[in-house]
Amino acid sequence: LTCVKSNSIWFPTSEDCPPGQNLCFKRWQYISPRMYDFTRGCAATCPKAEYRDVINCCGTDKCNK
């Protein structure tokens, strides 16, 4: 499985997930109005959302763009 690690306009990067990590995730963390921090990567299980987080998990290559 290949997941997006960072998704900048010029240099999107991806990573091959290690054995046992069969999900890609993208986390939006609310900072202030119109400002969010994005975290992307591989996971064995879908991370739990914390305060003001939205998490999307998926199981296909680069599905967490």
Swiss-Prot record:
It is found in: Secreted. Gene3D superfamilies: CD59 (2.10.60.10). Keywords: Disulfide bond, G-protein coupled acetylcholine receptor impairing toxin, G-protein coupled receptor impairing toxin, Neurotoxin, Postsynaptic neurotoxin, Secreted, Toxin. Monomer. Expressed by the venom gland. InterPro entries: Snake_3FTx, Snake_toxin-like_sf, Snake_toxin_con_site, Toxin_cobra-type. It comes from the Eukaryota. PROSITE patterns: SNAKE_TOXIN. This is Muscarinic m1-toxin2.
